[in-house]
Amino acid sequence: STIRDLDRQITTLFNRLPCKPLGFPVGRAPSLATIISEIGDIQRYPTLKKFLSHLGWCPQSFQTGNYRLEHPKMSHAGNKYVRRLIWMLSIFAVQRIPRYREYFQRRVSEGKAKMHILVAVGRKLLSALYAILKKGIPYDPNWEENSRLALARR
């Protein structure tokens, strides 16, 4: 069918990319190609914060005078289809990847809202993707633990 043909073409083009997220835990070539097409050149984002802001995956602060919004809402910046895709990848990660499932269950037991936890999982996935694309290295499943150890040694 036409959708399968398009998926094959996207996968073919995705495989030609010089720097692709090898071994990324969630998403196949079409979904990762969608995110990468929205990102463009990763060098445009000097920091993770700017990267997340471009994708609309950050809280939006609202303040006027002495009033400050108690619970900030998600920013609606960026492409809504990409945000929705990141949301779906977060749900998939919680359902299928033990490390993210454990994180989700631990945060639920601490009393956090499930939606907030999914946003945090999405941020973890996007920060891993940012590091992969920025440094040009394959995905390391233990990157969080390794970075904690590296920071502890300083």
Predicted regions located by residue number:
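A detector of single, family-specific signature residues
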Residues: 1-154
